[in-house]
Amino acid sequence: DFIMQNMKMQCNVISNAYSHGVKKLLFLGSTCIYPKDAPQPMKEDVLLTSPLEYTNEEYAIAKIAGLKMCESYNLQYGTNYIAVMPTNLYGPNDNFHLENSHVMPAMMRKIYLAKLIHEGDWKSIEVDMNKRPINPTDKLRAIIGEGNVDGNNDHERILKALEFYGIYNNKVVLWGTGKPLREFLWSEDMADASVHVLLN
């Protein structure tokens, strides 16, 4: 369903833009369209040269189709449908949940919580945990038992849950090899850049 929903959304937007006389459109893609093992720093011409990251493949395929659809409309109908591929975005209203956030908000929250633990600021930790409780995975449940982890839990249970995600007293553990290059872009800067692209 995921690939179908993404394809339908962008096909509807792009085709209806053309049928309603829209001459200029900005299509937001994603850097996941590039191959999993693309050389770093990444260049645009590596698109479709080797396999995609399997965990993002459906989304990437839909985004590639949208990019190619814009290209085809431009060639066939003379439209100015622009596809841009923003890098890793972060900003206001981001997802900071430890289970499923992207890399930047995950790092920010981990560092923030490690600092609070170091300072012994349990009031702020409880506020944070109530705002974004942890719904334990099977592995975490084996360590802390059943039930969500929120600010109403005892300190020991909260600390065990946070340690599971690599959050300690004034220290965080980040997963991965540290070799991949990443670029981050503030979402409001991306919004400004999008307006600039559309107006120029």
Model-assigned labels for residue ranges:
Residues S30-T31, D45, L67, P86-N93, ...:
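Active-site pre-Tyr helix/loop in NAD(P)-dependent dehydrogenases
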Residues S15, Y54-T87, V103-D121:
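Active-site Tyr-X1-5-Lys
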Residues I3-M7, V46, P51, T55-L67, ...:
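Short-chain dehydrogenase/reductase
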Residues M4, C11-E57, I82, N95:
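Conserved Rossmann-fold NAD(P)-dependent oxidoreductase catalytic core, especially the SDR/UDP-sugar
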Residues L75, L89, P105-L174, R182-N200:
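Alpha-helical substrate-binding/gating segment
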